[in-house]
Amino acid sequence: MRPAGFWPGFVLGVPYFSYIFWWFWSVYPLVSKGTDNNLSFLIILLPFVVTVTGMSFFWGIFGYFAHDIQRKTRRAFLPLFCAGIFVLVEYIRTWFFGILWAGQGSLLGAHWTLGNPAYLFADIGPVRQSASYWGIYGIDFFIVFVGSALFMLARPRNWGSKKIPSLEILSAVAILVFLN
């Protein structure tokens, strides 16, 4: 099993989730806790790296399945399948955050939606209003569906490389997210 599509998704997730979880560093000088700066840097770095890597792993999973499905499905259904896979992976990722940092008094469930791309569109009125009907996962579905459909329309059918589609789909998601 070669993870051909995994790495583009994972690499896209690392800077995205590094930005999302940058707030970990707001407690950086742990002087109030009596630790020196070097030790406090390491105390914060470890959970930051574990969280960013763990969250990026799921975008890598999406990239892997998007790459795999593009070889097995008809071209017309590719945006539908990619959007469905992304929504499923995002839902599983929300559970993972709670499991990763479970402790006494922790809540497990799909309510840890930190970093969901749908939140980047919260300032757009029609998107925000439509979220009451289909939620953040519907917005995620729409983002990936439109992005992958646009890239499919722009890509010639006889383009030789089989490794490009997952990167194209992930790039479409990145463009839509970061152009907000």
For each predicted feature, which ranges?
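Membrane-embedded alpha-helical bundles of multi-pass enzymes
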Residues: 1-180
